[in-house]
Amino acid sequence: MATETFARLRFARISPQKCRLVADQIRGMPVERALQELTFSPKKGAAIVKKVLESAIANAEHNEGADVDELKVSQIYIDQGPTLKRIHARAKGRANRILKRTSHITVAVGEKVKG
């Protein structure tokens, strides 16, 4: 398998800033190690990124016939999705805006370079 295999999750209800904390931890890791890191991380983003990583691994196995032991997280990036704008009622007839941010998560797995 010379190419990378991708998996994407769009419109995930987590802010990109919080999700990037998790993504930065597993970038470049072998997939087995990355899955362990995500399994034991207490962050909400870890569970979401783990599902996308598992999907990328399954895509590599099914579509490319890749060996799981040879895969690593070659790329992972979190882009900002659309923001849901909500209001929060305050005193004296005022209102504050609440921004509910979304993320587009992209994970690419590729084979480790031998040598």
From Swiss-Prot:
GO terms for cellular component: cytosolic large ribosomal subunit. Signal peptide: none annotated. Keywords: Ribonucleoprotein, Ribosomal protein, RNA-binding, rRNA-binding. GO terms for biological process: translation. PROSITE patterns: RIBOSOMAL_L22. GO terms for molecular function: rRNA binding; structural constituent of ribosome. It holds the Pfam family Ribosomal_L22. CDD domains: Ribosomal_L22 (cd00336). Belongs to the universal ribosomal protein uL22 family. Part of the 50S ribosomal subunit. This protein binds specifically to 23S rRNA; its binding is stimulated by other ribosomal proteins, e.g. L4, L17, and L20. It is important during the early stages of 50S assembly. It makes multiple contacts with different domains of the 23S rRNA in the assembled 50S subunit and ribosome. This is Large ribosomal subunit protein uL22. It comes from Thioalkalivibrio sulfidiphilus (strain HL-EbGR7).
